[in-house]
Amino acid sequence: MFKQLLAKCIEGYTLTEEEAYEAMMMIMSGEASASQIASFLSILRLRGETVDELTGLVKAMRNRMMTLDYEEEAIDTCGTGGDGASTFNISTAAAIVVSSLGVKVAKHGNRAVSSKSGSADVLEALHIDIQATPEEAKRALKTKGLAFLFAPLYHSAMKYAALPRKEIGFRTVFNLIGPLSNPARCKRQVIGVYSTQYAEKLAETLHRLGSEHVLLVTGKDGLDECSISAETDVVELKHGEIRRFTIAPEQYGLARGKLEHVQVRTVQQSAELLKAVLEGRANESAINIVILNAGVALYAAGKAATIREGVEMAKEAMMTKKAYEQFERLRMKEVEKYA
């Protein structure tokens, strides 16, 4: 069956949502060989994925993932990765700021693939627990307001695609659908996208999948974050409506900075800069890029009515050390209490 779907793609046809779903289910059950998976990913990348295909692939991925049975509303700040900019972990820092203001954050992430430092790598360097089970993650959400959902734990069926992805070495559709498959089924997200051409497709896909409020952001300097050194293209899905606009740091009283001031070479440098930001002693560009991204996330979460209000809330959380106190809370180890 996979051969037939592959042949259809090679002949220039696109897959229906149902066919894409079937293809993904076969990949995740080990029915497709490594070379077939590599061919499939290469063809989709070359011609571009349709919304039907993206929807089918995400539905299958969600079908096979381990879910977090968490009833309260939570937000995710996650990116496609692969922007090649080697920045510190901005979305992780923003997640800490957002969670310090009472918003539950189910942070979906992984180890570094193309970047210098994945969110799992930097959290380990900072001695912040990565929850090993859904039960631990639920407890962390309840007691600390932030849980880290380590992607390989929740998406174990993706193991069959690991080798072909590594061997072909370029970004594939899996970079796009990973952030759309949060185990907590977050309906509110900020998703950093490495290329703005994909943002509208992803917004339409999320609309079909029932998301409520999602902002897909791409810096004009190529960042898969809201940038401090350039304008940022935003595609917003809100209650079924999709609109596109551009934001700039100056709109929110933030000075335009330099990209090199938020770049790092190692996991340790990323961890040190993230900690310095929350302590308020980092460079202005690093502090402001976290404030901007946290502000956008607070808006997506519904905590703030506008991005401007979200930015002001994030500034205050930084100035009052509320964000740093949350950082220290996350680093505290839980002590088991026995009756």
From Swiss-Prot:
Anthranilate 2 binds at residue 165. Mg(2+) 2 binds at residues 224-225. GO terms for cellular component: cytosol. The keyword Amino-acid biosynthesis applies. Mg(2+) 1 binds at residues 91, 225. InterPro entries: Anthranilate_Pribosyl_Tfrase, Glycosyl_Trfase_fam3, Glycosyl_Trfase_fam3_N_dom, Glycosyl_Trfase_fam3_N_dom_sf, Nuc_phospho_transferase. Catalyzes the transfer of the phosphoribosyl group of 5-phosphorylribose-1-pyrophosphate (PRPP) to anthranilate to yield N-(5'-phosphoribosyl)-anthranilate (PRA). This is Anthranilate phosphoribosyltransferase.
